[in-house]
Amino acid sequence: MKKLRFFVVSDSVGETAEIAVMAVVSQFRPNFDQVDIRRFPHIQDMGHIENIVTIAKKQKAIIIYTLVKKELRNALDQLGEQNGVQVIDLLGPMMDLVEKKLEQKPLEKPGLVHQLNDFYF
């Protein structure tokens, strides 16, 4: 069995996406050791995204991402499609839905959930 690679891409620390990958992968024991997870935190620009997609293509990795900036989400989706790299957006669809329901644009500031946790807990 060949190794399955996940690239976790985030504009914050990447914990949310990594936990989601682990939740999925845990359902496929005893093959857990056949999975490689690599985290790419604090991604803020197109140059980083282009490099990650290039590496993912070479390594046949699946990209799982949590980016709050719509411009970066769209770019990653487009580059993934152009390069034949599977890309999964964990936050975008929910952010788009909440934006429509609240009729309000999101702040698009990375790391706010960590500030919230510090405030409440």
Residue map of PLM features:
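Structural motif
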Residues: 6, 9-12, 61-62, 65-70, 86, 92
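N-terminal accessory targeting/assembly segments
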Residues: 1-24
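Structural signal for conserved beta-strand scaffold positions within catalytic alpha/beta enzyme cores
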Residues: 8, 39, 87-89
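Metallocofactor- and cofactor-centric catalytic cores in central/energy metabolism, strongly enriched
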Residues: 36-67, 73, 78-81
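Short helix-loop-beta junction
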Residues: 23-33
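Conserved beta-strand segments of alpha/beta enzyme cores
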Residues: 33-36, 86
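Long, charge-dense
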Residues: 86-121
